[in-house]
A protein has these predicted regions:
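Short beta-strand/turn micro-motifs at beta-sheet edges
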Residues: 7-13, 56-59
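Low-complexity intrinsically disordered segments
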Residues: 6, 67, 109-113
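Short amphipathic
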Residues: 22-24, 111-115
């Protein structure tokens, strides 16, 4: 009888596993344009990064809020970590503090990293 479990066996993990960075934001509509500009800036850098396989931004507006998710797929966890350091340097060069920006604009955020798998 075949294994009926919906969970993968160890040999079913994607090889090599890619990494998904999925971020969620809730942005007050009044600050959406400023936030959208930052998202476009970041997305432009990600799309040109040699180890970023895919970058997408999606949004939904309701009740005076804009709900946003960003999804980026990376070759590896090391590639993601290196890209985060590169972006931190770009932010520093431009005098941009992401945490302060989010706080000043009342934007709530959640950042999560997942490893891909084959089911």
């Amino acid at each position: 009888m075949k294994n009926a479990s919906a969970l993968p066996m160890n040999d079913q993990l994607a090889t090599p596993a890619t990494v998904l960075r999925i971020d969620r934001f809730t942005c007050p509509l009044a600050h959406w344009l400023a936030f959208a500009e930052r998202l476009a800036f970041i997305d432009g850098h990600l799309r040109s990064h040699p180890h970023c396989r895919m970058s997408r931004v999606a949004s939904s507006e309701r009740d005076g809020q804009v709900y946003v998710i960003t999804i980026a797929e990376w070759d590896s966890r090391d590639a993601l970590l290196a890209a985060k350091q590169e972006m931190a340097a770009v932010y520093a060069e431009n005098g941009f503090d992401p945490a302060a920006f989010l706080s000043q604009h009342g934007i709530e955020s959640e950042f999560t990293t997942f490893e891909t798998m084959v089911l």
